[in-house]
Amino acid sequence: MKGRLLDAVPLSSLTGVGAALSNKLAKINLHTVQDLLLHLPLRYEDRTHLYPIGELLPGVYATVEGEVLNCNISFGGRRMMTCQISDGSGILTMRFFNFSAAMKNSLATGRRGLAYGEAKRGKYGAEMIHPEYRVQGDLSTPELQETLTPVYPTTEGVKQATLRKLTDQALDLLDTCAIEELLPPELSQGMMTLPEALRTLHRPPPTLQLSDLESGQHPAQRRLILEELLAHNLSMLALRAGAQRFHAQPLSANDALKNKLLAALPFKPTGAQARVVAEIERDMALDVPMMRLVQGDVGSGKTLVAALAALRAIAHGKQVALMAPTELLAEQHANNFRNWFAPLGIEVGWLAGKQKGKARLSQQEAIASGQVQMIVGTHAIFQEQVQFNGLALVIIDEQHRFGVHQRLALWEKGQQQGFHPHQLIMTATPIPRTLAMTAYADLDTSVIDELPPGRTPVTTVAIPDTRRTDIIDRVRHACITEGRQAYWVCTLIEESELLEAQAAEATWEELKLALPELNVGLVHGRMKPAEKQAVMASFKQGELHLLVATTVIEVGVDVPNASLMIIENPERLGLAQLHQLRGRVGRGAVASHCVLLYKTPLSNTAQIRLQVLRDSNDGFVIAQKDLEIRGPGELLGTRQTGNAEFKVADLLRDQAMIPEVQRLARHIHERYPQQAKALIERWMPETERYSNA
């Protein structure tokens, strides 16, 4: 095996790795020895020195050594083995709920043992529940660990001990095999070598400060963080370079339709809308496909920006497709576009999963013939049987629901006669700048950072659930006395549509009883699309006073007369999602209110989060706070990019490095294309498929 590169050495060549273990390791993307070496510890335990039992404090993880005083099995409410050991400074009780006869026999009175675990304060002094322990024999010197003990991310059926043993073998192989140094010499100067960094992180010497590792500041970590962030940025540059190789139809200035629409509008676009439209039009005039992300806060007028971009393509006799994540939102877009485009003689088509038979067929024919110039729908518009006629622009609404993979698939679908469509992605979920720079480095970004005049900021209050009857009275007052409409949003922590629907139904029944004079509607994710549409339509037309809903109404529903929203259990949702929900009110000129109806007691984090919402109506401020409180993985969600999860890097902790990383990534991309490709393959093997799309 000498001299081989470790990315070519399969894990099956290690002692103890058979087919069953290979399959389990594959679940956490471990296939080669290099993969294993890059599978870094989540945290470390210090088992290198002994703690006197008498000095143990609750919450401290420690190794203790002592003589077994007694070991008993009790059969109270639950079968349990308790064992007491003493080191002269104090007595520790160890409790085990899963144990065997062999374990009990090994802990015979008079034996000496080592135990490692979290100290707790028990009825009779210090105790540990299910500590790891090892019997020492009678007089032997305790065998302590020589390095800090790593704790790895794992999967069902793969124990920490197994990963540690396999990693020991992998580290031994570093002496005979090579792991390729991929950083150019001018970057790696003065840094730890890769083998050095890996040895340090897998087996840190006891002299190393745990606090350095916990803060991510150790030179070994910085070496790998730099490499991982570079790989991430290089993958985005590769996607981008791939896009630049393609041709798009250049759509030069042709403003006749645009000017007609602007003249017919009862308002003037904001400065921010005009600026973003100009950025889009500049991109569309080029012969490479536009790839632009438009971020706009709730209610900032992204739909008008999309309409003006669409008119540029339609003026050239081309087609435009707009894809939204839900039928509800797609239908609303279709209605908006019809209102704007019908007077201009432009036909708007609509395609969704629920359309069947003749209706669907005739819509497909109208698209294929070019009779329909603007097509709005869900992902159904990109199914095989839909044929476009000169598709030049694809607009995707709500990027969070579509990953990078769908983004590329959709692009391929639109390719005709060697031309790729321009692509515009719109999101109402503001993304903090550092995250946007990393997760969307393959896109140009525009921000609509101004709300249209006449929008009233929503006043937000947090009220405990114990005052529920007061809130119900407030709903009655808003709907009857003030003639307004209200939302009551039910949330559940489980990602279960069924449980969420049941909770909403129970609340609906409760509110119908409490408010007999109101018409109360219900909408949730388990209802058929047609039922949902019917309820939403009657709410929009003012036939319902109060709408009980699950978080399905998070995006895009526009009812200007709704001025009050109650959100139950807001502590269960992220800030960005709460801000999205709150954006359903405050869409008219009247003062609007949002009540966060929380369950007591609230944790510290929940209190901080609800305070952020009370203090700010700015989606970008809220997104930055959400990032600080929850971290980047949750905010971006792997559902969305498939790559928010990093092995060593942490976008929040390492955000100061990102501008420099981007500069270095461009340098490697231009000067060292082979290393760039190898870095992407090392850290992001999944992405490599897409950068060749």
Could you describe each region identified by the protein language model?
Residues 58-79, 117:
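Structural detector for short beta-strands of small beta-barrel domains
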Residues 267-277:
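N-terminal pre-Walker A segment at the start of P-loop NTPase domains
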Residues 74-264, 638, 671:
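Upstream accessory/linker segments immediately N-terminal to the RecA-like ATPase cores of bacterial MutS
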Residues 1-15, 23-26, 232, 242:
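Long, highly charged, low-complexity intrinsically disordered interaction regions
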Residues 601-693:
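C-terminal accessory region of SF2 helicases/translocases
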Residues 275-278, 288-611, 667, 671-675, ...:
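Inter-lobe coupling/hinge segments of SF2-like helicase ATPases
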Residues 42-62:
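Short boundary/loop segments of OB/S1/cold-shock single-stranded nucleic-acid-binding domains
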